[in-house]
Amino acid sequence: MEMERINANTIRVMLGNDDLAQRGITVLDLLGNHKQIESFFYSILDEVDKDHTFATNEAVTFQVMPSQSGLELLISKSGQKNDDSAADQTDDEGTDTQVPDYIRQQLQGLDASDQQDHQAVDEGGYIDADKAPQTELVLKLKDFEDFISLADTLRLEGGKSDLYRYKNAYYLVLTFYPNEISSDEAHDQMAVAMEFGDRSPLSSAVLSEYGKRLMETSALETARYYFK
C-alpha cells in the first residue's frame, strides 16, 4: 500500500490486489455490503492518517478508481462538521448509496448519462434493447469463482449479460436478441453457460426488483477485464 498526501485536506492511497487480498476485500465487494465497504475505507484512513489530521468529527468523502492492478482511493475532508445539520447530509444511508454508485460507474466504464441510455451493449457492438425481441437465460451460480470461469470461457455474442446477487447467491442473466444472432447460436452459448451453473426459475424482473445488480449489460466482459 502506498500513500501520498496531496494537500492538507486530501490523501491518495494506492492499494494493489495483494493489499486488498490481505484485507479480505475484492473489487466485487465494493459493489456489495455497504457497511463493510465503509468500515474498510475508514480502516484505511486510520492506517494512513498517522498524524490524526482527519478529526473524527469532520465529514470525510471517499472516491474510488478501480484498475486491473487494484484501486486508488482519494480521501478528502468535506470541510463540514458532523453537527446535526451536517448529519442530515452525511448520515450512514447517504454514504452507503453514494460510494457504491460511484464505484459501480467506474467498474462498468459508465458515467451518469450512460446510465440513462436505453441501449444494450454486447461485446460486438450496440443493440437497441427496446425494439429487439429477447431470449433470456437466468443462471444460478454456485459461487463467484464459477462466474469468473464462465467469463473466461464464454465470449457472448448477440446479447448482454447482467450479474445479480440475491439471497446470498449469484445470478447471471443472459439476454439474446434474435435479430442479432440465430436461435442455434444462442442455444449453443446458453449450453456453454449452463456448464457453470443451474438454470433458475427466477426471472430477470424479480432479480431486478429484489436483488442487487452488481454488473450491468456487459458483466462477462467486465469480469474478464478486472479478474484476469
UniProtKB/Swiss-Prot annotation:
GO MF annotation list: protein-macromolecule adaptor activity
Family, as annotated: Belongs to the MecA family.
Species in which this protein is naturally found: Lacticaseibacillus paracasei (strain ATCC 334 / BCRC 17002 / CCUG 31169 / CIP 107868 / KCTC 3260 / NRRL B-441)
Protein name: Adapter protein MecA
Free-text note regarding domains: The N-terminal domain probably binds unfolded/aggregated proteins; the C-terminal domain interacts with ClpC.
Function: Enables the recognition and targeting of unfolded and aggregated proteins to the ClpC protease or to other proteins involved in proteolysis.
The protein's assembly and partners: Homodimer.
